[in-house]
Structure formats: C-alpha cells, structure tokens
C-alpha cells in the first residue's frame, strides 16, 4: 500500500510512522479547534477517528473520561500506547470501530469530536446520524478540518492522491440540518488577514485572530471548526 492510499486507513510500519507524524503536524490545527470546545470536568467524550491518539490525551486533561474509536487497528494500537498511563487510570479507553456503527449505547456522550477525519467517512449524512444517536440530548458534536472545501491547490492535489472528500461549511451544515442538529456554529480562520469568521443563526461576524500558528498552518488559508448540538 502506497504512502498516500495508506492515509485513509493506516496500516503496518508505514501507518505507524504516518500517525506519529500527524500527531505532530496537525497540532496547531487541533489546538485551534479545541479553543472552540468547552470541556467540563464531568464530561464523557468520544473522539471518532482518533488516529494517533494525541487529541484523546489533550481532552483527558479536562474531561472525566475520553473514549477513542478508529477502524484502523494501527491507530488503535498507537492511541493505546500514547495514552497508556491514562488507560491505566481508567480515564481513557480506545476501541476498534466504525463511524457507521459505533459500539456504544444511545445517549452516552456529552461531547463527540472528529479531527481531520470526516473526509473519509462513507455516507456522511448517515454517519452524522450515528454520531447523534450516541450523543446525549444537548450534547455537542465538533468537527475540525484544515480546509473549507477543496477550492485551493493543496486540497485539489490531496483529493487526487488520496481517496477523500473535502466538504465546505455549507455542505456540512446541510448534512447536520438533515439530521436535526441545532445551534450549528461555523468558525473559519483567515490566516492571511489574521481574522476569525463566525457563522451562527444566519449571522456572520469577524473578530481578530492572534492565534500563534506554526508555519504548517499557512498551507491553508481557511481552517474550519464546526460545532452542533443534539
């Protein structure tokens, strides 16, 4: 399996290397995504498509317990390794599973996150419905992506090399509305102008964004975080 095709579902030694690299390279984006999430001490959190497990580790600093799920066994193994101590403390659990059939009861989680992973979800509208099933009433679903749509050169190249779909904020909002999510808020980061664009309740506002970004962030002009409630 080639380096690009392996990104969808990391396998073997190459997958392990890629996952460790993503833990590092995606950090600026992930920390920006997490700025828009209010994790409380009693929250039970699920990270879908947990990859290398670093975001599980970050959220476990605030939450009561964090679960991770991924359909890549290599991701599950590395996530367990990264969070070994927290697993031993009972604060983290990592499982193999698929977003279309999550191995949890209805109304289980206060927060569900998806960092850099919805690109690979089959039947995304159905997947959003499955996320909603295991989310508690009033719970929050948060997605983090490095690009708002594919109308930029880096994402156009990525789509050709990797089997992935890059969605715009309007498309994702539409899928959420089709599943009756509420209080949908879109946060877009305009790195060029150092502004954050916030879309909510039919209104758009811009605020100054002084987020201290690494050079990695400048590959994409518009990071995106979307939050929605059940």
Segments (PLM) and residue ranges:
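Conserved alpha-helix/loop element of class I SAM-dependent methyltransferases that forms part
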Residues: 24-43
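Class I SAM-dependent methyltransferase SAM/SAH-binding core
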Residues: 46-101
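A short acidic, Gly/Pro-enriched loop at the edge of an enzyme's catalytic core
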Residues: 100-111
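A short glycine-rich, Lys/Arg-flanked "PGG" loop and its adjoining helix->strand segment in the class I
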Residues: 125-137
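Conserved beta-strand signature within the Rossmann-like core of class I S-adenosyl-L-methionine
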Residues: 139-145
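Short, glycine-/aromatic-enriched active-site segment of Class I SAM-dependent methyltransferases
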Residues: 146-163
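Short alpha-helix
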Residues: 164-180
